[in-house]
């Protein structure tokens, strides 16, 4: 069963490439404090949770299904119970989405570009992640991260983000698991086929970083998390780079790829 992971069901595809389940995000280890300077923590007043990625001082990229009222975006966070001097909080000034057509499926265009109400300052714990300059390569080892659940189906949420490695898989592996996926889409399939490591509730909108490049935005995955042969689904960022760059440059009428 596919689940759009918004608080109760988001993904943290923590697939431990060549490692055992002692290192899970439903598995994974605590992220190094310096490896997620671009990672945004997204909340609203009711506690709805997603992640996002800072791509420059004024813009954050996340999943469209993470859109909500009263959104607050936290940057420079590591331990939710400890506030660092350089933590910064912003709210959206503008939100940009891809226009959907009648031909689009639920898998399409799950991407939201947020302009912050004021620029953030780079610091020891805050720095943007560049957009990809090459398309993703099948078989790549990819990094996932977030504050999502570390157990499933009875979710327990950590105070610190967890990180793990997964593999970029052939699209057909996700087609075989999730009924109704089209023959082609702008979705990446990533995970570990044996299961045991996975993204989970609270990780939606977070980045998939393959060979050092920001290639995916967490869209959906299996429920419960970490089942065998149930990889995660990620919006393919490379396909949207022209749209993103046009919006940032002020061309707000720019169209997304079909």
Swiss-Prot record:
GO terms for biological process: proteolysis. Gene3D superfamilies: Trypsin-like serine proteases. Residues 19-24 form a propeptide. It comes from the Eukaryota. The keyword DNA repair does not apply. This is Snake venom serine protease PTLE1. GO terms for cellular component: extracellular region; secretory granule. Glycans are attached at residues 44, 79, 103, 121. It is found in: Secreted. Disulfide bonds join 31-163, 50-66, 98-256, 142-210, 174-189, 200-225. One of its GO terms (molecular function) is serine-type endopeptidase activity. It comes from Gloydius halys (Chinese water mocassin). SUPFAM superfamilies: Trypsin-like serine proteases (SSF50494). Residues 25-249 form the Peptidase S1 domain. Residues 1-18 form the signal peptide. Expressed by the venom gland. Its EC number is 3.4.21.-. Snake venom serine protease that may act in the hemostasis system of the prey. Monomer. Belongs to the peptidase S1 family. Snake venom subfamily. It is an enzyme of class 3 (hydrolase).
